Amino acid sequence: MNAVTESAATTAEMPVPFVFTDAAADKVKQLIDEEGNPDLKLRVFVQGGGCSGFQYGFTFDEEVNEDDTVMNKNGVQLLIDSMSYQYLVGAEIDYKDDLNGAQFVIKNPNATTTCGCGSSFSV
């Protein structure tokens, strides 16, 4: 008689690599609708620069690259390239509209320091 055992690793759920909030997805959907191009996707990336060493960037893209991680939320596709992915694991991508203005906000547990503008960080 053969027995099959399952390890905890095979039965546990994989952690969500990042959180794309409803508010962020809804705002992106609104912006895509305004552009009139349903093929647009939101690309979030990290690049060198800013006062803390790295900075976040957002752009619309029609293409999904081979190394992209794709997240679907509320009819919107979020793209993160493989280099940026390592800096964004565990992060939350949100959209805030309050007295300080309207903007996309990234809460990143990997950032050891951030600057006052909120778009630059170091690890």
Curated annotation (Swiss-Prot):
Keyword Glycoprotein: no
Cofactor note: Binds 1 iron-sulfur cluster per subunit.
Gene Ontology biological process: iron-sulfur cluster assembly
Keyword Iron-sulfur carried by entry: yes
Cofactor(s) essential for the protein: iron-sulfur cluster
SUPFAM superfamilies in alphabetical order: HesB-like domain (SSF89360)
Positions of iron-sulfur cluster binding: 51, 115, 117
Swiss-Prot/TrEMBL keywords: Iron, Iron-sulfur, Metal-binding
GO MF entries: 2 iron, 2 sulfur cluster binding; 4 iron, 4 sulfur cluster binding; iron ion binding
Protein purpose: Required for insertion of 4Fe-4S clusters.
Family: Belongs to the HesB/IscA family.
Record's subunit section: Homodimer.
Name this protein carries in UniProt: Putative iron-sulfur cluster insertion protein ErpA
Organism listed in the record: Burkholderia ambifaria (strain MC40-6)
Gene: erpA
